[in-house]
Swiss-Prot record:
Pfam families: Ribosomal_S8. The gene is rpsH. This is Small ribosomal subunit protein uS8. Keywords: Ribonucleoprotein, Ribosomal protein, RNA-binding, rRNA-binding. Belongs to the universal ribosomal protein uS8 family. GO terms for biological process: translation. PANTHER family: 40S RIBOSOMAL PROTEIN S15A. GO terms for cellular component: ribonucleoprotein complex; ribosome. It comes from the Bacteria. One of the primary rRNA binding proteins, it binds directly to 16S rRNA central domain where it helps coordinate assembly of the platform of the 30S subunit. Part of the 30S ribosomal subunit. Contacts proteins S5 and S12. It comes from Bordetella pertussis (strain Tohama I / ATCC BAA-589 / NCTC 13251). The keyword Ribosomal protein applies.
Length: 131
């Protein structure tokens, strides 16, 4: 059976793994999921990630990050979904928690944070909020 929203599945796996204090979480890999994991690593929300498995069925393994026994990611939620895509122009990209969190945006120049998209002057699809 095919998955209707692989990005929501990725975010849910991360959220569920952190609730039970797992150190790593594994999921099927794709280019978009790897790009999201790269943004999460660059922003300091995860310790790292690696792509394992065969070329036919690659697996993305994310190493979660904790601080003083609590997950670094307090909130991670999907914004744009298959039934209702959310696109924002370069001037209307939202801030998450007045800049304390990040919005991950898929643009014509790749997947990036809201701050980087504003700096580059590009808009795109708002994939998720992370705080």
């Amino acid at each position: 059976m095919s998955m209707s929203d692989p990005i929501a599945d990725m975010l849910t796996r991360i959220r569920n793994a952190q609730q039970v204090d797992k150190t790593t979480v594994t999921m099927p890999a794709s280019k978009l999921k790897v790009a999201i994991a790269t943004v999460l690593k660059d922003e300091g929300y995860i310790d790292g990630y690696s792509v394992k498995g065969t070329q036919a069925k690659p697996e993305l393994e994310i190493t979660l990050k904790y601080y003083a026994g609590r997950p670094v990611i307090e909130r991670i939620e999907r914004v744009s979904r298959p039934g209702l895509r959310i696109y924002k122009g370069r001037t209307s990209i939202p801030q998450v928690m007045n800049g304390l969190g990040v919005a991950i945006v898929s643009t014509s120049r790749g997947v990036m944070t809201d701050r980087k998209a504003r700096a580059n002057g590009v808009g795109g699809e708002v994939l998720c909020y992370v705080a």
